[in-house]
């Protein structure tokens, strides 16, 4: 098979891998919205751990959620995890 024909076959077949059989929706998602959902589905990454406040009078502490929020976080009661496109996972405070 000549190179041109082979390339055309590859270009026609390759996009099929991005769609599931059920409804033709893209498997890779929208790059932003479902990144955190996929991350949380892998193991116990949404388990809460104790949050340590590093500065008195500040809402920022350390580690509100296991293996996810890193070193910048806030108390467990006001903390939620966010996913920043191209920057990864982090935390934000609700207050």
Curated annotation (Swiss-Prot):
Propeptide: 25-45
Highest taxon above the source species: Eukaryota
Record-annotated disulphide pairs: 64-73, 69-81, 74-91, 79-93
Residues making up the signal peptide according to the UniProt record: 1-24
UniProt keyword annotations, A-Z: Acetylcholine receptor inhibiting toxin, Disulfide bond, Gamma-carboxyglutamic acid, Hydroxylation, Ion channel impairing toxin, Neurotoxin, Postsynaptic neurotoxin, Secreted, Signal, Toxin
One GO cellular component term noted in the UniProt record for this chain: host cell postsynaptic membrane
Tissue and organ expression note: Expressed by the venom duct.
Positions where 4-carboxyglutamate occurs in the chain: 50
Entry's localization field: Secreted
Modified residues (4-hydroxyproline): 56
One GO molecular-function entry: toxin activity
Function: Alpha-conotoxins act on postsynaptic membranes, they bind to the nicotinic acetylcholine receptors (nAChR) and thus inhibit them. Through its two C-terminal domains, this homodimeric protein would bind to two nAChR allosteric sites, located outside the nAChR C-loop of the principal binding face and at the adjacent binding interface in a clockwise direction. This toxin specifically blocks mammalian neuronal nAChR of the alpha-7/CHRNA7, alpha-3-beta-2/CHRNA3-CHRNB2 and alpha-4-beta-2/CHRNA4-CHRNB2 subtypes.
UniProt comment concerning the protein's domains: The cysteine framework is XX (C-CC-C-CC-C-C-C-C). Displays a mini-granulin fold, a structure composed of two short, stacked beta-hairpins connected by two parallel disulfide bonds. This newly described fold is derived from the same cysteine connectivity as knottins (ICK fold). The name 'mini-granulin fold' comes from the structural homology with the N-terminal region of the human granulin.
Family: Belongs to the conotoxin D superfamily.
Subunit-structure text: Hetero-, homo- or pseudo-homodimer (identical sequence, different post-translational modifications).
Name of the protein this chain belongs to: Alpha-conotoxin-like Cp20.4
Phylogenetic placement of the source organism: Eukaryota, Metazoa, Spiralia, Lophotrochozoa, Mollusca
């Amino acid at each position: 098979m000549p190179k041109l024909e082979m390339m055309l076959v590859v270009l026609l077949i390759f996009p099929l891998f991005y769609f599931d059989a059920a409804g033709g929706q893209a498997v890779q998602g929208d790059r932003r919205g479902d990144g955190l959902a996929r991350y949380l589905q892998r193991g116990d990454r949404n388990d809460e751990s104790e949050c340590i406040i590093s500065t008195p009078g500040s809402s920022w502490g350390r580690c509100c959620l296991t293996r996810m929020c890193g070193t910048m976080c806030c108390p467990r009661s006001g903390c939620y995890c966010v996913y920043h496109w191209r920057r990864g996972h982090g935390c934000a405070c609700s207050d």
